[in-house]
UniProtKB/Swiss-Prot annotation:
Subcellular location: Cytoplasm
InterPro entries tied to this protein: Aminoacid_DH-like_N_sf, Glu/Leu/Phe/Val/Trp_DH, Glu/Leu/Phe/Val/Trp_DH_C, Glu/Leu/Phe/Val/Trp_DH_dimer, Glu/Leu/Phe/Val_DH_AS, Glu/Phe/Leu/Val/Trp_DH_bac/arc, NAD(P)-bd_dom_sf
Pfam families: ELFV_dehydrog, ELFV_dehydrog_N
Protein name per UniProt: Valine dehydrogenase
EC number, UniProt record: 1.4.1.23
Species assigned in the record: Streptomyces virginiae
Gene3D superfamilies: Leucine Dehydrogenase, chain A, domain 1, NAD(P)-binding Rossmann-like Domain
Key word Repeat present: no
UniProt keywords, alphabetically: Branched-chain amino acid catabolism, Cytoplasm, NAD, Oxidoreductase
PROSITE patterns (UniProt xref): GLFV_DEHYDROGENASE (PS00074)
Stated role: Oxidative deamination of branched-chain amino acids. The catabolism of valine is the major source of fatty acid precursors for macrolide biosynthesis and a vital source of antibiotic precursors.
UniProt binding sites for NAD(+): G188, V189, G190, K191, V192, G193, H194
CDD domains: NAD_bind_Leu_Phe_Val_DH (cd01075)
Length: 358
């Protein structure tokens, strides 16, 4: 066993505090595939979660990420009212360098070998066209194109759900769900953030954006000239008069550096795992910053892919995603009742649903 193998095993057995049911290490030498599939829980039903294609620095980092992400999917699916547990997959490597049809087909065979215990979908670095390829080897694939029996890109409903979470946050904090005149900062205007900006503008918000990809910023500012762009996330979170901060890129946006200087009164965004470490939710509460739990408000996408399994209906999905408004308000009420941060309140509600199902 190599030193790298030992590192992966150490991560699996000593860093897994979430009690995962199954972790599968996948390797196909012919295509260059290296992937990890993690099933956190099947208490509510088959594990459901996307496939992330990312150039992790080490295999240990990939394993740690998939454990964290799959656990988060259990909570997300529970809070979304879905009959699914939580799972996730990561493919290790730069998708722009190594993604190929053969690699995706090999990955599909690994997912298929689980016999339906895990259902995959798109995530960072994977797209509808990729799921169409995976589906050729695996029927437990969602996020496919409409012409291949799927629902297409889920970013539209994800953005809609985040918007509902923002409206609920505004209702809770200011007594009015309207965002008219509120200044909202969106960090990351890619697949989801771009659609979120449109909802915000339609509701009358003043929008400030940033993104590491200049082309994403240019797309938004070209389509919406009223949008203000700033250089980076640090500039965004320090924006004077910012009411709401929406992290919509990768996780860990709320950390020991960002929280102390954050000017917003609300955090509500599409990114997964926004809290960099345990305790950040308390830091936010200590600064009287209202945090809408990420896995609750960004559940629109998983609502869509779950619906795809029964024959996708957009109106049915949108109606379910609109309930994120009420769910978010219920979390804030539970947090106040129990004297805990909203993130802890959401966890308690999700854990109760999973416990009741066992």
């Amino acid at each position: 066993m190599t030193e790298a193998d030992n590192g992966v095993l150490h991560t699996l057995f000593h860093s897994d505090q979430g009690g995962h049911e199954q972790v599968v290490l996948c390797q196909d030498r012919a295509s260059g595939l290296k992937a990890v599939i993690a099933i956190h829980s099947t208490a509510l039903g088959p594990a459901l979660g996307g496939t992330r294609f990312y150039p992790y620095a080490t295999e240990e980092e990939a394993v740690a990420d998939v454990l964290n992400l799959s656990r988060g999917m259990s909570y997300k699916n529970a809070m979304a009212g879905l009959d699914h547990g939580g799972g996730k997959a990561v493919i290790i490597g730069d998708p722009e360098q190594i993604k190929s049809e053969d690699l995706l087909l090999a990955f599909g065979r690994f997912v298929a070998s689980l016999g339906g215990r895990y259902v995959t979908a798109c995530d960072v670095g994977t797209y509808v066209a990729d799921m169409d390829v995976v589906a050729r080897e695996c029927r437990w694939t969602t996020g496919r194109s409409p012409e291949n029996g799927g629902a297409g890109d889920s970013s539209v409903l994800t953005a809609f759900g985040v918007f509902q979470g923002m409206r609920a946050s505004a209702e809770h904090l200011w007594g009015d769900p309207s965002l008219r005149g509120r200044k909202v900062g969106v960090a990351g205007v890619g697949k989801v953030g771009h659609h979120l900006v449109e909802h915000l503008l339609e509701d009358g918000a003043d929008v400030v954006i940033t993104d590491v990809r200049e082309e994403s910023v240019n797309r938004s500012t070209h389509k919406h000239p009223s949008v203000t762009a700033v250089a980076d996330t640090e500039a965004l979170i320090r924006t004077e008069g910012l009411d709401i901060y929406a992290p919509c890129a990768l996780g860990g946006a709320l950390d020991d550096d960002s929280v102390p200087v954050l000017t917003a009164k609300v955090v509500c965004g599409a990114a997964n795992n926004q809290l960099a470490h345990p305790g950040v939710e308390k830091d936010l509460a200590d600064r009287s910053i209202l945090y809408a739990p990420d896995y609750v408000v960004n559940a629109g996408g998983v609502i869509q892919v779950a619906d795809e399994l029964r024959g996708f209906d957009f109106d049915r999905c949108k109606a379910k995603a609109s309930k994120i408004f009420d769910t978010t308000l219920a979390i804030f009420a539970r947090a106040k009742e129990d004297g805990i941060p909203p993130a802890a309140a959401a966890d308690r509600i999700a854990e109760q649903r999973m416990s009741d199902a066992r």
